[in-house]
Curated annotation (Swiss-Prot):
UniProt name for this protein: Arabinose import ATP-binding protein AraG
SMART domains xrefs: AAA (SM00382)
Lineage top rank: taxon: Bacteria
Top-level taxonomy: Bacteria, Pseudomonadati, Pseudomonadota, Gammaproteobacteria, Pseudomonadales
Binding sites annotated in the UniProt record for ATP: G46, E47, N48, G49, A50, G51, K52, S53
SUPFAM superfamilies: P-loop containing nucleoside triphosphate hydrolases
Quaternary structure, from the entry: The complex is composed of two ATP-binding proteins (AraG), two transmembrane proteins (AraH) and a solute-binding protein (AraF).
Keywords, ordered alphabetically: ATP-binding, Cell inner membrane, Cell membrane, Membrane, Nucleotide-binding, Repeat, Sugar transport, Translocase, Transport
Organism field: Pseudomonas savastanoi pv. phaseolicola (strain 1448A / Race 6)
Length: 507
């Protein structure tokens, strides 16, 4: 029987009691039990695929558990829908925000609860109410603004204000800072502390260790869909202990760096200009070299990669590959030349979500085998997919599993497997480990170093200072669409890189 759920102002703890969830061929969660206290920020940690997001979807009513119950205060629940979860005082703020870009901020905030008069929406009252909800949270946002015109950080604040409008006692954040600037992250941290101090239960999922130690009061660790341990006091934890608990092994050197012999010139860029580049860009990378690009948001690194992969057209400059002139008019030109891109936004640009893992791996490889005949082509694709899944250690119940159900780390490894099916000379990796857990990061770093050892020129864009210093042979720094410095591995440190990355005063 479906239980009646009413709007609650319960101020009790959130308890998960024996939660289990099974998908076809996969046991996503097994007997999860722990408690998150009011007035605390409780982190959920674990490798990709550990079950954190599945648990939040059960909390939010998107998934129904096969076993177990939720408890808020003294009331037990088994949510059958998101509406039931919301009515119980729960708000889940997902990585992909559930807002309508074409509507105004006010319409998004009050969707389903708009004030009306004589059967018509009372827009004056709607804007006033929206302004009240934004006050102290995002005072600079005009409720009349179209939501799609806001920055991602501002949209996230609107999502939080929406949760507040429903008097949410339990608020869960799923990777909330993955695409935010440093200033937006600072603002979000302050808001989370404020929500905690108001006595709410805050669940926080992030792969960024510095955020966990900055804002969280307790940590629960998951592995392979199972509860591992809850640390009730952050004083009991340090970075190494938490990583070991998450991955089940001690990772001494996550970056796996080892010196390599470079094998001669690969790609040379001279005087390149195009959208997002404000000064001519020139650099060269050698075969077997890992070249890092560091910079702050808006530095022009992603725009440079779009030019090098043929996604946008240059307005000036020349390219040489293996000493020969190269002209890129389209992504096909780049792929045929052996310059392959793993994009920053893998969900939108890197994968076909509704297609299988095998189909995603074989997308790039098909043009080389169109004349094999249907039977041989099909056999080759099956064998290639299985081979890449094995070599990349992609965790999937089957090659036919839709790739959208894989963790971020496994999606990234599948994309790398796609390019390994093709002739490759230069690999462009744009934020390759964003939103990926420590264990999967270590695997991707190992793949990068193995490719370099095979003579591939690997160019990595990363906003993670430790990462770019840890894996690169040489680092170029960009700021405001220009290269501002070059450092060899042994001379790079955080201070020098940040100084080069800061915007310059233009005359």
């Amino acid at each position: 029987m479906q239980q009646a759920i009413e709007q609650t102002s319960i101020n009790g703890a959130l308890r998960f009691n024996g939660i289990g969830k099974v998908f076809p061929g996969v046991k996503a969660l097994s007997d999860i039990s722990f408690e998150a206290r009011p007035g605390s920020v409780h982190a959920l940690m674990g490798e990709n695929g550990a079950g954190k997001s599945t648990l939040l979807k059960i909390l939010g009513g998107s998934y129904q558990p096969n076993s177990g119950t939720l408890q808020i205060g003294e009331q037990s629940y088994q949510f059958k829908s998101t509406a039931e979860s919301i009515a119980a005082g729960v708000a889940v703020i997902h990585q992909e925000l559930h807002l309508v870009p074409e509507m105004t901020v006010a319409e998004n905030l009050l969707l389903g609860h708009m004030p009306n008069r004589f059967g018509l929406i009372n827009r004056g009252a709607m804007y006033r109410r929206a302004g009240e909800l934004l006050k102290g949270l995002a005072d600079e946002i005009d409720p009349r603004t179209r939501l799609g015109d806001l920055s991602l950080g501002q949209r996230q604040l609107v999502e939080i204000a929406k949760a507040m409008s429903r008097n949410a006692h339990v608020i869960a954040f799923d990777e909330p800072t993955s695409s935010l600037s440093a200033r937006e992250i600072d603002r979000l941290m302050a808001i989370i502390v404020r929500l905690r101090d108001e006595g709410r239960v805050i669940l926080y999922v992030s792969h960024r260790m510095e955020e966990i130690f900055r804002v969280c009061d307790a940590v629960t660790v998951f592995k392979d869909g199972r509860f591992v341990k809850t640390f009730e006091q952050m004083a009991d934890l340090d970075h190494d202990r938490l990583v070991t608990c998450m991955v089940g092994r001690d990772i001494q050197n996550i970056y796996n760096y080892r010196p390599r012999q470079h094998q001669g010139p690969s790609l040379r860029v001279t005087g390149l200009l195009g959208p997002g580049l404000h000064e001519p860009v020139s650099f060269a990378v050698e075969k077997g070299e890992v070249l890092g690009f560091f910079g702050l948001v808006g530095a022009g690194r992603t725009e440079l990669f779009r030019l090098l992969s043929g996604l946008t057209r240059s307005t000036a400059g020349t390219l040489q590959l293996d000493g020969k002139p190269l002209t890129l008019k389209s992504p096909r030109d780049s792929i045929e030349a052996g310059i392959l891109l793993c994009p920053e936004d893998r969900k939108k640009e890197g994968i076909v979500p509704l297609s299988s893992v095998a189909e995603n791996i074989n997308i790039g490889a098909r043009p080389r085998h169109v004349n094999l005949g249907c039977l041989i082509q099909g056999r080759w694709e099956r064998d290639n997919a299985r081979s890449q899944i094995k070599s990349m250690n992609v965790k999937t119940p089957s090659p036919e599993q839709q790739i959208m159900f894989l963790s971020g780390g496994n999606q990234q490894k599948a994309i790398l497997g796609r390019w390994l099916s093709m002739p490759m000379k230069v690999l462009l990796l744009d934020e390759p480990t964003r939103g990926i857990d420590v264990g999967a990061k270590s695997e991707i770093y190992e793949i990068i170093h193995n490719l370099a050892a095979d003579g591939i020129a690997v160019i990595v864009v990363s906003s993670d200072l430790m990462e770019v210093m840890g894996i690169s042979d040489r680092i170029l720094v960009m700021s405001e669409g220009a290269i501002t410095g070059e450092l060899n591995r042994d001379e790079a440190d955080e201070s020098r890189l940040l100084q080069l990355a800061l915007p310059r005063t233009r005359s």
